[in-house]
């Protein structure tokens, strides 16, 4: 079998889960290996007691691949790592560590769907992406998921997940069973998401999404927690404008003395001003009751300038008017900043 390998392999950079990739291997039967990478440097005064700016580095690196079985199916897989990722391994390591964001293998059966297992890219990202448009701030929904599953990064990714995804016309579907692992202390979990894209011709496109997840802790490991998440939202596309709106709730039982409930609303707007410039704005509200009592009320304004098709400069300001949360006398935070302290962000992002 004739094979082609790029003569110069790209040096180690750090990976993104975007569709951007460099193909470094291709076989005659269609099998491929792709390199993903991202490097970034950010200046921000987020969570700085003196209000001074500080520099932060982030980077990702990884490989994804596909091996052709026949014309109907392929073996697929991905391993993606990040410096300073929001993973459990970094919560127990004081130093920035290279930790796994995604590590999975599966079968792509074309029109019959795709099955993946491991630390997968959750189908619930169809929902969370509605609010996840900024380089400088994170979505806040499902923030309590890691109280029942230590490996969970909200509902984006969790160890030991077996997932099925497919597309039927304009309908995208995803369903998963979460087995967990020895670190998870999880009895079971499952989730599902549906997205339907409505083409309205000259009036644009509407893409409503519904999502849910359920997790149960393993009482044999002393984890007597129960977690439920659901959300509804939509994106609307018209020319160079994209608008998004979502609402979600999650309930955590067995961690606090009462049932802890987060209610989250997020609104986003993106305008591609030109091939080089993009403008973004958004509002985020989170209200917790029965738990840490955290409240978020964030307004974000962001400007992106595209240096190349894949690399950009971002600058933003996040106005925060929430209230800090507390658990056992210790402040809880989300997004790396106090809920009542605004901050700026300036960053350069290189992507391959």
Language-model region placement:
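Cleavable N-terminal export/targeting peptides
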Residues: 1-28
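Outer-membrane beta-barrel "beta-signal"
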Residues: 305-307, 336-352
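Detector for outer-membrane/organellar transmembrane beta-barrel domains
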Residues: 187-301
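Outer membrane beta-barrel
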Residues: 23-45, 49-182, 186-188, 196-198
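Repeated loop/turn-to-beta-strand initiation elements of outer-membrane beta-barrel proteins
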Residues: 69-75, 111-115, 170-173, 201-208, ...
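Hydrophobic, lipid-facing positions within transmembrane beta-strands of outer-membrane proteins
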Residues: 57-61, 101-105, 158-162, 190-192, ...
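Transmembrane beta-strands of outer-membrane beta-barrel pores
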Residues: 41-45, 81-85, 121-123, 170, ...
């Amino acid at each position: 079998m004739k094979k082609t390998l790029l003569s110069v392999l790209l040096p180690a950079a750090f990976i993104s889960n975007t569709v951007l990739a460099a193909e470094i291997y291709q076989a005659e039967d269609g099998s491929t290996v792709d390199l993903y990478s991202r490097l970034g440097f950010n200046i921000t005064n987020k969570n700085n007691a003196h209000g001074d700016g500080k520099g932060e580095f982030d980077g990702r690196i990884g490989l994804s691949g596909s091996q052709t079985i026949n014309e109907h199916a392929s073996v697929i897989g991905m391993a993606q790592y990040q410096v300073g990722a929001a993973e459990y391994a970094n919560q127990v390591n004081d130093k920035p560590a290279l930790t796994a964001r995604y590590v999975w293998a599966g079968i792509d059966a074309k029109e019959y769907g795709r099955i993946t297992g491991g630390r997968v890219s959750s189908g619930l990202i169809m929902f969370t992406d509605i609010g996840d448009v900024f380089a400088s701030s994170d979505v806040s929904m499902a923030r309590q998921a890691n109280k029942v599953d230590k490996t969970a990064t909200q509902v984006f990714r969790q160890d030991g997940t077996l997932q099925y995804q497919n597309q039927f016309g304009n309908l995208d579907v995803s369903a998963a069973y979460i087995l967990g692992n020895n670190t998870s202390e999880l009895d079971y979990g499952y989730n599902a998401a549906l997205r339907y894209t409505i083409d309205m011709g000259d009036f644009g496109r509407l893409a409503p999404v519904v999502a849910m997840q359920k997790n149960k802790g393993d009482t044999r490991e002393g984890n007597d927690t129960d977690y439920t998440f659901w959300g509804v939202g939509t994106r609307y596309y018209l020319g160079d404008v994209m608008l998004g709106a979502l609402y979600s709730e999650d309930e955590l039982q067995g961690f606090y003395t009462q049932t802890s409930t987060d209610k989250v609303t997020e609104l986003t707007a993106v305008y591609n001003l030109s091939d080089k410039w993009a403008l973004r704005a958004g509002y985020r509200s989170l209200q917790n009751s029965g738990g840490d009592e955290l409240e978020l009320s964030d307004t974000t304004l962001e400007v992106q300038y595209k240096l190349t098709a894949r690399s950009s400069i971002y600058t933003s300001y996040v106005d925060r008017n929430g209230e800090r949360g507390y658990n056992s006398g210790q402040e809880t935070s989300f997004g790396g900043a106090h809920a009542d302290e605004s901050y700026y962000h300036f960053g350069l992002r290189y992507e391959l």
